[in-house]
């Protein structure tokens, strides 16, 4: 029996192995815990800037979760093939809604609507497909100094959003109240403490735990309203073109450029995955197919109302730490996200998170984005 269990356990470290459901579930849940808040927070932030109703916010969150699941499945199990190309890297990566696009989406939303963002996302997806096809030829146009500077600037530009949320959200009646600051800094303290001193699941779930603590503390202050949860449906599929699709030149150019940069940056996540967990560098075809899938899934996501996705570095960290590269484990994580994406009550519950809690929890996320940019810049070879 022990030999059988040992053999089954070894399946976890095999890309195409078939571990038992009991072994795969906790590892899959670990991936979900590490990324789910980061996956829905951009949708919540954009909904606030765009002035979406509670029902439309739920639809946006649903689509974001569903598209994260679909994008991950396509990357894990490529099934679309055309000549020498296939859509999906076939590597153990998790896809989720990217914070990198939040500053540009906020800027667009101030003068346009969500449909304009989704239209630009379609253009960005086309750009990513082109980058994927010619990645070997154009990779030199985006050295670490360029991509790192852009990523660092994105991280810094997100801080005003976090501070506004910590204060209660711009335009709220209690903006800047002491209650908001107390809850926000308590949430930030919990996240920071667990991130620096926690181990295992406590460290991986630091943002989720911080939000749970902040959420509970905010209840006595009357910051939580659960009425939207009661009104939400139990089951609903993502709605095709719910927000419409509109094209505006400046929005398309801005998001298209960011898609090109993120396409090249994705090479870092693919490389970290294969080098750290599989003891090899990624093959050119894997990079090419992965970036092309990034473009295709974002086009599909725009049609279903989902925001731009990208590889999630925190999940890359889990894979390289545990060495669990089995695609069925990550596929199960994607399935959990997919189920969450078709349950409006779950999405409605996420909309009840007070803005001060969300602000306190995401400061560390924005800091990590800025640090990633600095690391990229530091890795560049300088000629003096």
Language-model segment annotations:
Residues 1-27, 226-241, 275-282, 290:
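Intrinsically disordered, low-complexity non-transmembrane regions of multi-pass membrane transporters
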Residues 1-93, 99-108:
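N-terminal signal-anchor module of multipass membrane proteins
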Residues 21, 47-88, 257-327:
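Membrane-embedded helical hairpins/re-entrant loop segments and their flanking transmembrane helices
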Residues 29-36, 54, 146, 177-181, ...:
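Hydrophobic alpha-helical transmembrane segments of multi-pass membrane proteins
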Residues 54-59, 189-237, 242-268, 381-384:
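Flexible hinge motifs at transmembrane-helix junctions and intramembrane kinks/re-entrant loops
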Residues 59-60, 83-99, 140-149, 202-209, ...:
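Short, non-helical or kinked segments that cap or interrupt transmembrane helices
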Residues 108-225, 334, 338-384:
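Membrane-embedded alpha-helical modules
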Residues 195, 315-330, 336-341:
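Interfacial segments of multi-pass membrane proteins
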């Amino acid at each position: 029996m022990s030999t059988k269990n040992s053999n089954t356990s070894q399946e976890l470290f095999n890309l195409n192995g078939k571990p038992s459901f009991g072994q795969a579930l906790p590892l899959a849940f670990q991936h979900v815990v590490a990324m789910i808040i980061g996956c829905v927070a951009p949708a919540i932030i954009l909904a606030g800037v765009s002035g979406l109703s509670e029902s439309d916010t739920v639809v946006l969150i649903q689509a974001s979760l569903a598209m994260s699941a679909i994008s991950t499945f396509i990357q894990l199990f490529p099934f679309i093939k055309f000549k020498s190309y296939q859509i999906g890297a076939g590597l153990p990566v998790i896809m989720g809604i990217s914070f990198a696009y939040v500053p540009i989406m906020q800027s667009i939303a101030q003068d346009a609507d969500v449909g304009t963002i989704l239209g630009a996302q379609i253009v960005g997806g086309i750009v990513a497909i082109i980058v994927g096809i010619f990645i070997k030829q154009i990779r030199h146009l985006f050295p670490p100094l360029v991509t790192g500077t852009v990523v660092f600037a994105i991280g810094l530009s997100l801080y005003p959003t976090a501070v506004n949320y910590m204060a209660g959200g711009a335009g709220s009646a209690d903006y800047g109240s002491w209650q908001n600051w107390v809850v926000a800094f308590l949430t930030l303290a919990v996240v920071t403490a667990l991130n620096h001193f926690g181990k295992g699941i406590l460290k991986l779930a630091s943002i989720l735990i911080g939000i749970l603590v902040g959420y509970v503390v905010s209840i006595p202050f009357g910051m939580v309203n659960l009425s939207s949860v009661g009104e939400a449906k139990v089951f609903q599929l993502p709605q095709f073109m719910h927000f419409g699709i509109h094209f505006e030149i400046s929005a398309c150019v801005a998001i298209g450029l960011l898609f090109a940069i993120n396409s090249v940056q994705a090479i870092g996540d693919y490389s970290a995955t294969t080098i750290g967990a599989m003891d090899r560098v990624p093959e050119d075809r894997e990079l090419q197919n992965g970036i092309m899938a990034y473009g295709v899934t974002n086009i599909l996501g725009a049609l279903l109302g989902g925001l731009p996705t990208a590889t999630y570095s925190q999940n890359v960290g889990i894979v390289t730490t545990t060495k669990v590269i089995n695609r069925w484990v990550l596929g199960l994580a994607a399935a959990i996200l997919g189920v969450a994406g078709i349950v409006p009550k779950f999405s409605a519950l996420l909309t009840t998170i007070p803005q001060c809690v969300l602000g306190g929890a995401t400061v560390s996320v924005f800091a990590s984005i800025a640090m990633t940019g600095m690391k990229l810049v530091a890795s560049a070879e300088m000629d003096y």
